[in-house]
């Protein structure tokens, strides 16, 4: 995609309308531009007040394939989100990232061991399942 398209979408991530932010995140994930600016903007959306926006941002990050420690840690944090859909998207995104990075499995396994007594451990197990089953 052209730089102008990416710039326009980045601007829309700050729109006051949640459906606009949501759609812009989805579009950025589909474009596949994993520039630091795009990744940083999507990481910021993981803290959005709207669950559909957090969901789309997590999915987009999983699609971009940037398995940096910052991205992996942010997605692990979403495994404790209050909504199922966001936790599931984070688990799926971690599974996607694990296809290209060997450190994701170890990081998720460590997260599970640290949270084994919490109500969120199942979401960590889902992430690990996505990693192991979809691994190439």
Where are these regions (language model features)?
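Ankyrin-repeat and related helical/solenoid repeat scaffolds used for protein-protein interactions
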Residues: 84, 88-96, 102-113
């Amino acid at each position: 995609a052209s730089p102008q398209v990416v710039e326009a979408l980045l601007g829309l991530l700050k729109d006051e309308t949640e459906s606009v932010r949501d759609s812009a995140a989805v579009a950025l994930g589909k474009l596949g531009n994993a520039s630091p600016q795009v990744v940083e903007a999507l990481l910021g959306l993981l803290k959005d007040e709207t669950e559909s926006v957090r969901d789309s941002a997590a999915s987009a990050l999983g699609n971009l394939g940037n398995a940096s420690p910052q991205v992996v840690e942010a997605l692990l944090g979403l495994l404790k989100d209050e909504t199922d859909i966001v936790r599931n998207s984070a688990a799926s995104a971690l599974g996607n990232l694990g296809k290209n990075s060997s450190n994701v499995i170890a990081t998720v396994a460590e997260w599970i061991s640290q949270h084994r007594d919490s109500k969120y451990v199942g979401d960590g197990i889902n992430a690990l399942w996505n990693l192991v089953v979809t691994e190439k």
